[in-house]
């Protein structure tokens, strides 16, 4: 439990936090949206930062893990929009996907690899607070750096 929420650090091996800190580029570490924002707003955020998924949180960061209420995934939004199940003016909470898996910053990189088996991204927690998002692309970048 302590490791999963980022309170403990694995000794002697690369950690998920190392991957997060090694990310390059101009993307803020915790791109997010809120349940009351519109689908259009969420799409604008996805496009602005060039990400394909992001957490939905109840408050402005810093937030605790329990305040992550879901995620926005471009694939799901595109499907809902094209099939008439969503409108651009709808609130995000009506179309959000389940929350992204969470891994502790101090956990070994393998924990992120395992979590990414069934998800496109994971939220990295440090002391119980979401600090950022790591994707498969981030892991590949870390491994080749």
Which residue ranges define each predicted feature?
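Tandem CBS (Cystathionine beta-synthase) repeat/Bateman regulatory domains
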Residues: 1-145
């Amino acid at each position: 439990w302590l490791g999963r929420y980022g309170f403990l650090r694995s000794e002697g091996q690369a950690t998920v936090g190392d991957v997060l800190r090694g990310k390059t580029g101009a993307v803020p570490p915790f791109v997010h949206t809120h349940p009351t924002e519109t689908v259009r707003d969420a799409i604008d955020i996805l496009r602005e930062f060039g990400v394909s998924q992001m957490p939905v949180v109840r408050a402005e960061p810093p937030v605790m893990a329990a305040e992550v209420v879901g995620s926005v995934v471009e694939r799901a939004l595109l499907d809902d929009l094209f099939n008439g199940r969503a409108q651009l003016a709808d609130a995000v909470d009506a179309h959000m996907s389940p929350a992204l898996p969470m891994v502790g910053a101090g956990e070994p990189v393998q924990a992120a690899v395992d979590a990414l088996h069934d998800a496109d991204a994971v939220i990295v927690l440090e002391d119980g607070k979401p600090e950022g998002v790591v994707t498969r692309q981030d892991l590949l970048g870390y491994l080749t750096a």
